[in-house]
Amino acid sequence: MTLKAEIQAIVDAIGARRRFVVSSHARPDGDAIGSEMAVAFALRAMGKEVEVVNADRAPAPIMQFPGVPDIRIAPTVDGAFDAALIMECSDLARTGVSGLDAFFVVNIDHHPGNTGYGELRWFEPSAAACGEMVFDLITALGVPLSREIATHIYLAILTDTGSFHFSSISPRTFEICKATLEAGVDPVLVARNVFDSNSMGRLKLFAAVLGAMQIASSGRVSLLYFDDPMARAAGGTYDDTDGLINLPLTVKEIQAVVFFKHVAGDEYRVSLRSKGDVDIGAIAKIFGGGGHKNAAGCTARGALQGLREMFVEKIERAIDGRSADR
């Protein structure tokens, strides 16, 4: 199907149905929340019944945005729906919400590694954020761009482009942002809510994690580590680590960051970020994860030092333009 046909099929499916559940990936970020909330507001404007259900709460700064406190946090869907719209989620299991597959599933995503689940699928890997796709969908639905819808689209784009730092941005990105500002978005207020709403515990946790930062011998890769005892000592939480990974990239020489977050035993959630042409999405894929060229993640098991060395070796190869799949 062409892009136009994919959007039209989704528009037709929405028009033929009344009750919708909307969800995204577990531990949702700004693009996940912004995309699903923009869609929810648009569907309600059409007179549809909508419930947004996520496995986890949004990060504290994003809780300030319209409708986000009303998202139902639950491990399973409770209700009868005509369709499930899954936004910005590469695999249905990653929602962390069971029962979604009982409905007509529409899969809208920009992750290259999407597994292709659902009855209708629309992938746009070139989109800088799923929020860009949501803008096109809402335009196709003929729903006016309200301030609430526009704010969530702008939130999605702002956060998933690393504040317009990532190479995924395009002229289209700024055309959409222009439209959201014309609809009443205050970009300064959005930025302040996202980036200037730190608690003291979060600031202390940043200090603890950065204080323990390691730098690979080449000086090009930063290694971060987090566990629950660090959070308790700082008076912070797991969610307070959101955004921390981007700070080492502000150092000119640093080309990539690996952030190990301890889960239990020898299991770690690994977040990856990079600059320019360093494709850490391919590295995440080696470990069963995925994401984008400059932002990705995976889960890894093993001794921490061994994992550090393994990731550094693969990232160094990627920086040098060699294959990391060795």
Region spans (language model):
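An acidic intrinsically disordered interaction segment
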Residues: 1-8, 93-102, 126-134
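Hydrophobic helix-and-loop "lid/oligomerization" segment in the mid-to-C-terminal part
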Residues: 2-26, 32-63, 75-81, 159-287, ...
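Short, motif-level signal for alpha-helix interfacial/capping segments enriched in acidic residues
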Residues: 2-9, 87-88, 138-140
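Generic enzyme active-site microenvironment
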Residues: 23, 27, 86, 107-108, ...
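Short acidic, glycine/serine/threonine-rich loops at helix termini
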Residues: 34, 64-66, 117-118, 135
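Active-site cofactor/cluster-binding pocket
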Residues: 66-68, 74-120
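Short, hinge-like loop/turn segments at secondary-structure boundaries
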Residues: 68-71, 123-125, 275-276
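Short alpha-helices
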Residues: 111-177
